[in-house]
Amino acid sequence: MSSNVEKILIIGLGMIGSSIALSSKLKGIEVFGFDNFADTTSIALDKKIIDQSIEHFDKIVDENFINNIDLVILAVPPKQTLDVLIQLKDIWNSEITITDTSSVKNHIKLEDVKNVVLSHPIAGSDKSGLEAADPELFLSLIHI
């Protein structure tokens, strides 16, 4: 897995995913975004929170697309994390690093998967959604 990240895909564009997107863009990283709610993805694109939108999940696992992505970040609700990871099984053990932002991991059991790094960036706010995106949300915070 390369340490040079140039293109990322964020799945889930609420406060956490959008904050990661904004922070990444400030570092010159190209950000692709997907959300189950097409309106959210469209707003994120219009507000320049993401550089490119992914309209359908099927495109994510398309080899022509995913092989150009360095890092996939899941910023979905905890109960959806495992389901999304399973949908990404075609890229398990590839050169693409997959991580998440979920606070709950006890239901996630993956054996012999070398490119999934579970994480919890202990961050949040009393606000939610795309409108609460903050590129400085993760500064000086602990990540476990």
What is the role of each PLM region?
Residues 82-131:
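Rossmann-like NAD(P)(H) cofactor-binding subdomain of soluble oxidoreductases
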Residues 51, 70, 96:
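Conserved acidic residues
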Residues 8, 72, 98:
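Receiver (REC) domain switch-region micro-motif
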Residues 65, 136-137:
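Structural alpha-helical scaffold elements that stabilize or flank donor/cofactor-binding regions
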Residues 1-57, 61-64:
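NAD(P)+-binding Rossmann beta1-loop-alpha1 motif at the extreme N-terminus of oxidoreductases
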